[in-house]
A protein has these predicted regions:
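Conserved small-residue
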Residues: 1-297
Length: 297
């Protein structure tokens, strides 16, 4: 018989769960403008953040002997240290009894120094990075009443109205959308609207009154229908950004330098250059899988 029981218990949390510090020298070729790389290897998974690791080591006069008292390394020279990772990034340890030098060495013997990069940071493409697209999963967990939902949707309705009634705004809308398709990071729309837009705008340029034709009216109606369909799927453009939270990065740098790991931020604070200091933010995990994910700071 399964019985639920309530009781008080102590839990522990890992402030550096699944993250690594990766020296900026590793961000080369196609990753020169990136700031995080999600890395994979055999039984290894970690989010590596761009860090001036070697500069920090030199500035703090950290020696190889110092590092060996605070962790484990096979490096023979301090200049070889380009990555600092965490035990829970090394999934192999779960299957062999936990963290030990013997277990780490066993893993090293069976892997190469080539890591797979499966993800990196990408900024939002909407309105030059000022807007981000929501999902129905997020909206369903906010508990909005009718009035709040109408307030949230009003900018989107106003946007659709401008697309419907302003030819120049329609041109702006599709210049932005077409640019997103060409960068290779967005799937091409199956309705072919971007390709049709290219033809439509050429005709508008050549014929002053083309926007009064049935051809333009049909195109405009298809665009408006597509925007409404996106809203029904929960794809609402909101003031926001895509960002990867770097948990306690300065504290990890302090730890490898042997310094006291005091917190750089107060409880309930995050730092993001996209927003003004003191702004109230709603953070949501992606993918958004539970109503417990939203975090207000």
């Amino acid at each position: 018989k399964l019985v639920a029981e309530q009781k008080q218990t102590e839990i522990t949390n890992d402030i550096w769960d699944g993250e690594s510090l990766l020296d900026e020298s590793m961000f080369e070729n196609g990753y020169a403008d990136k700031h995080i790389l999600l890395l994979r290897n055999k039984f290894f998974k970690s989010c590596a953040f761009r860090t001036k690791l070697q500069k920090w080591i030199k500035d703090k006069n950290i020696t190889l002997a110092d590092l060996k008292t605070r962790g484990f390394t096979l490096a023979t020279d301090i200049s070889q240290i380009v990555m600092v990772t965490t035990p829970n990034s090394l999934k192999y340890l779960k299957f062999v009894g936990g963290l030990s030098e013997k277990n780490i060495c066993k893993w090293v013997e069976n892997v190469t120094d080539t890591f797979g990069v499966v993800k990196w940071d990408k900024s939002t493409k909407f309105f030059h990075g000022d807007m981000v697209q929501s999902s129905y999963q997020l909206l369903n967990t906010l508990g909005l009443d009718k009035a709040q939902a109408e307030e949230l949707l009003k900018p989107s309705f106003d946007y659709i109205s401008l697309v419907r009634n302003d030819v120049e705004f329609m041109r702006y809308h599709f210049t932005d959308a077409y640019a997103r398709e060409k960068d290779g990071e967005e799937k091409k729309a199956p309705d072919g609207l971007a390709d049709r837009a290219d033809v439509i705008f050429r005709l508008l340029f050549s014929c002053t009154h083309f926007n009064t034709t049935a051809l333009y009216a049909n195109f405009r109606d298809d665009v408006v229908s597509g925007l409404k369909s996106s809203l029904r799927r929960g794809h609402i453009l909101l003031n926001g950004t895509n960002a990867t939270l770097f948990g306690n990065g300065p504290e990890l740098l302090k730890y490898i330098a042997g310094e006291k790991t005091t917190s750089e931020l107060k409880k309930g604070q995050i730092y993001c250059k996209r927003f003004e200091s003191g702004a109230k933010l709603l953070c949501a995990r992606s993918p958004h899988i539970t109503m417990g994910n939203p975090y207000c700071v």
